């Protein structure tokens, strides 16, 4: 497994805006999707391409196209939906799989309540979308679910991650690559990321 922190001035600037307590819901949504586009760009650098011939304005021309890689986006409900449009802007042909989980606030462990995976998941690269990687419990459970379904390759895109959650995933899933805009300082006693973004789901959906 590799952890890729996308070190770019645009990423830093946009993430800094998300950290501001009074950012409007509409702006939070827009920036979350902008950051997801930048993360998706980095996460797909290793896709193979092949030459194909197309009809250009002056006749046939050889162009590059992605070679036979089927992709499914996997937003984790509900906050992951706030990154989905950005991902599909970059990869409009991707299928969408949905995993519904919430974190038990007492045990901090995930509780699964809904799953709908794309057909032929065993032939697809899955890209998990979630703004926050905190304890790693939800991501761990989602990776297990995808692996049990036969998914051959898994990556994850996150806006911020805590070192504790990253360690959990690195230790258990060394074959999964993680792309993140920032690795924050730590978790607090309630399992929230510091400095973090606050409740990303509430900020995306305007429920608080």
Curated annotation (Swiss-Prot):
Keyword Iron-sulfur listed? The answer is: no
Binding-site residues, uracil:
193, 198-200
Cofactor(s) needed, names only, are: Mg(2+)
Give, as in the UniProt entry, the pathway in which the protein acts: Pyrimidine metabolism; UMP biosynthesis via salvage pathway; UMP from uracil: step 1/1
**Residues the entry annotates as binding 5-phospho-alpha-D-ribose 1-diphosphate:** 78, 103, 130-138, 199
High-level lineage: Bacteria, Pseudomonadati, Thermodesulfobacteriota, Desulfovibrionia, Desulfovibrionales
Question: What EC number(s) has UniProt assigned to this enzyme?
Answer: 2.4.2.9
Give the record's family classification: Belongs to the UPRTase family.
Comment on bound cofactor: Binds 1 Mg(2+) ion per subunit. The magnesium is bound as Mg-PRPP.
**Which processes are annotated in GO (biological process)?**
UMP salvage; uracil salvage
Any GO molecular function: GTP binding
**Cited NCBIfam families:** PRK00129.1, upp
| Descriptive protein name | Uracil phosphoribosyltransferase
InterPro entries hit by this protein: PRibTrfase_dom, PRTase-like, Upp_B, UPRTase/APRTase, Ura_phspho_trans
Give the record's keywords alphabetically. Answer: Allosteric enzyme, Glycosyltransferase, GTP-binding, Magnesium, Nucleotide-binding, Transferase
Q: Which reaction does it catalyse?
A: UMP + diphosphate = 5-phospho-alpha-D-ribose 1-diphosphate + uracil
Activity regulation, in the record's words, is: Allosterically activated by GTP.
Q: Which SUPFAM superfamilies did the record assign?
A: PRTase-like
Originating organism:
Nitratidesulfovibrio vulgaris (strain ATCC 29579 / DSM 644 / CCUG 34227 / NCIMB 8303 / VKM B-1760 / Hildenborough)
- Database matches in HAMAP family: Upp_B
Query: What the protein does?
Result: Catalyzes the conversion of uracil and 5-phospho-alpha-D-ribose 1-diphosphate (PRPP) to UMP and diphosphate.
For this protein, the record's Pfam families field holds: UPRTase (PF14681)
